[in-house]
Amino acid sequence: MSKKDHRKNFAHSNHEKTTEGDIVRYQNSQRLKKKFYEDELNKVQAELVKMQYWVKATGYRIVILFEGRDAAGKGGAIKRLTEPMNPRGCRVVALGTPSDQQKTQWYFQRYVEHLPSAGEIVIFDRSWYNRAGVEKVMGFATEKQVEQFYVDCPRFEQMLTEDGILLLKYWFSINDEEQEKRFQERIENEQRRWKLSPMDI
């Protein structure tokens, strides 16, 4: 594909990029053409394989957080990210509701045990930011616990990065109409129904 064709396909997606401080926002009002998407995905996945070799060779430790609204596409993005990777060096962590024992522990403790060793990539499908998100919204955490999280989270992440961990954080969002549409698709599709929780209905 020529550079001109590449630009044409990319422009067709009405791709918009805005920057606010350290935050980069991407907006797409149309879907990418399927062939263009698949071609680009193959290129990106090839680069991911190279990156994993580099991580192993250098001993880097990488943590990637995927956060966002329900049904925003976190799981699909993680699937495509990990498809080409060697599972020996890349793990996905998707923790459920804290157990009664975990509720008595330091809030970050259950995440610490999943942090990577040298040469590993760990992807969190939701993370410690649950405390400021779903736990806050659904009333699973007290106001005091949430306020303490706002103090502790930057300190915790600073400890990780100062120890040499490369921390990457991504937020996925969709509008209310698209979210409702995706919830309905999950209700109607038995193979996707497991993605629904009682809180989504």
Language-model regions: role of each:
Residues 1-43:
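Charged, amphipathic alpha-helical linker segments immediately N-terminal to NTP-binding catalytic cores
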Residues 33, 90-150:
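Conserved nucleotide-sensing/catalytic segment adjacent to the nucleotide-binding pocket
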Residues 46-56:
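Pre-Walker A adenine-sensing motif
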Residues 56-57, 85-87, 100-101, 113-117, ...:
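Conserved catalytic network of the ASCE P-loop NTPase/AAA+ motor domain
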Residues 58-64, 118-119:
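Pre-Walker A (Motif I) flank of P-loop NTPase domains
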Residues 64-82:
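Glycine-rich phosphate-binding P-loop
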Residues 71, 98-101, 127-130, 173-180, ...:
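Conserved nucleotide-binding/hydrolysis micro-motifs of P-loop NTPases
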Residues 134-150, 160-201:
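A glycine- and Lys/Arg-enriched "phosphate-lid" helix/loop adjacent to the NTP-binding pocket
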